[in-house]
Amino acid sequence: VCQPHKNRLMLMLKGSLQLGLLPQLHLNFDLMPVDFLARFIAFHSAGFNADSCVFNLHNPQPLSWEQYLDAFSRAGYCFERVSVAQWQQALRAVSLDNALFGVLGFYLDRLDKDIGDTTRILHDNARRGVQNMGEQYPEKDQALLNKGCNYLKTIGFL
């Protein structure tokens, strides 16, 4: 379950929205609905297969960072997309009340491993597990992105 106030990427997103500047990143972004995860876990907890008992529950459906940011733009958030260098320069002036303040060390000089390319994640067991359920990975479509934006707004994170 997403706990955005404890998640570096979510704090980076919120703090960047507070700054009005978001970095242009060329990577894919992961997003998996919790109801799908719950069904997956419930289905596979009933049995054990030593050859495929570890699942990397990553959703390989494509979603670029830019598409993710588009959802926040459509939700009414105003921000400028800037180069990573411009964004990192702006981080040097972040104040104590910005959500990024506590995680600045991860972003000032480089982007740490929590912003990685999801295309490198091995998910063969999970893919087979989804097929065994007779399901497909959820599409990372506008409806799912809107739901995520609304959730962050509803819980008072954004």
Please annotate each region the language model reported.
Residues V1-D30, V34-R39, F43, F72:
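NAD(P)-dependent short-chain dehydrogenase/reductase
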Residues H44-R110, L152-G156:
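Mid/C-terminal beta-alpha module of Rossmann-like enzyme folds, strongest
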Residues D35-A46, N146-K153:
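Two-component system phosphotransfer/interaction surface
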Residues R120-L158:
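Amphipathic terminal alpha-helices
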Residues G20-D30, A50-N56, R127-Y137:
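Glycine- and acidic
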Residues L31, P62, R120:
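Short aromatic/basic micro-patch
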Residues L22-Q24, Q88-M133:
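A hydrophobic C-terminal alpha-helical subdomain
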